[in-house]
Amino acid sequence: MKTVFVSGNFNVLHPGHLRLLRFAKELSDKLIVGVWSDRIAGKESHIPEDFRLEGIQSNGWVDEAFLLDESVEEVIRKLRPDIVVKGKEHEKSANPEAAILEEYGGKLLFSSGEVTFSSLDLIRNHIRELDHISINFPTEFANRHNVSKERLLEVLSKIDGVSVAVVGDLIVDEYVTCEPLGMSQEDASIVVTPIDSQRFLGGAGIVAAHASSLGAQAKFYSVIGDDDIGNFAMSELENSGVTPSVYIDPTRPTTLKQRFRADEKTLLRVSHLHQESIGSELRQIIKQEVHRSLPDTQVLIFSDFNYGCLPQELVTELIEAGQKNNVYMAADSQSSSQLGNVARFHDMHLLTPTEREARLSLRNQEDGLVVLGEKLSKHANAEHLFLKLGSEGMLLHARDDSNKKQTDRIPALNPHPRDVAGAGDSLLVLGALAIAVGASAWEAACLGSLAAAIQVSRIGNKPLRLDELQREFV
């Protein structure tokens, strides 16, 4: 494995740094970056060392980063990298690293990297940025159902400490930012060059991370492959405060969904996955682990992407176990093809399909939305049904205080979404948690819709925070 080492202050990750890191990564199998500690950097350190290290660790090209609290020469002697990369401006200066590298055959290279995009830091800021201005509170809907902001804040405060178990398909989402170069001369295809990439926890994993970030005690059950993507997912789960019971399936890779984007538009999506059901041994392990946790669990969430983690036999067994333990249950089953049947999650307290998923489940392309919702609710025996309609909002088919089913619509609360990925996950988890702690379906719909509006305000799946939701009530 070829290793490359880079070191520096990195007060601000400007485009020059990013080009240098990209150049270094292209030379290596493993890019290691040493960030000078406050002690070593001295007056050159304008930002605390922890923040500078975090900035480097967030870069998609960096495989390993650490605080460098000794001389660069000593670190090179310990690491023995194949190559050390420095900026072009150091080429005519004294470089004591050269003598050490020469001792064991290492190389010292100088480069700023190929200049491909001068505003990459702006892209990064754009990805992290959250646009609260475009989020609307559903005032008319709230008035129809006597939903007050004070009550919603009260519901949010009750989520703290709720015990949640999430079972489903773990996914890692990768956003590859590209610069378009033009049309190919050989065929009618667009030519791009990748200039940045960022990975996010997705699928059922982000559902568990949302729950934990909102204050719940989240346990997560799933499978991964024996690969770097799986290691990334495990690290993200643990950093989010989730307790993972995630098992390696040697027959499959960790599901990775790549989005290649340019100028804020997605050009292409590539999914690396196996859709076969998990084997009987893994199925038995997950069943036993979930069974063991259910007596102390208040909410059980199924997050199904039809990638094999939730075969019907396991689903049926877990539903029966949840009912025996009086656990509140919610489910979403996403169908990216003509496969999928959300109604297989029967007897749920909350079901959150899209219109397409509902029609696939019922094989019904004719009925209107209200009739469709009623039929699916009856077919799946769901207490509450949130039918997601994308930019048109959501249709609710839910029980009121008198135990009668009512239908209403809540509009989409963000008319200018930047990335719709993950909206359904945030709706599912906050809707389920809200109803589980005593909220009405209408209150849960308000909170879930606000969560979705926040999620689509930014690029990539990031765990929801309570303060983000509370800010919408100010």
What are these regions (language model features)?
Residues 5-17, 167, 191-201, 308-309:
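Short, glycine-rich nucleotide/cofactor-binding loops
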Residues 379, 383, 413-472:
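Conserved post-catalytic alpha-helical subdomain immediately downstream of the catalytic base
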Residues 312-407:
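Conserved phosphate/ATP/ADP-binding segment of small-molecule kinases
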Residues 1, 141-181:
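Positively charged, low-complexity intrinsically disordered leader regions
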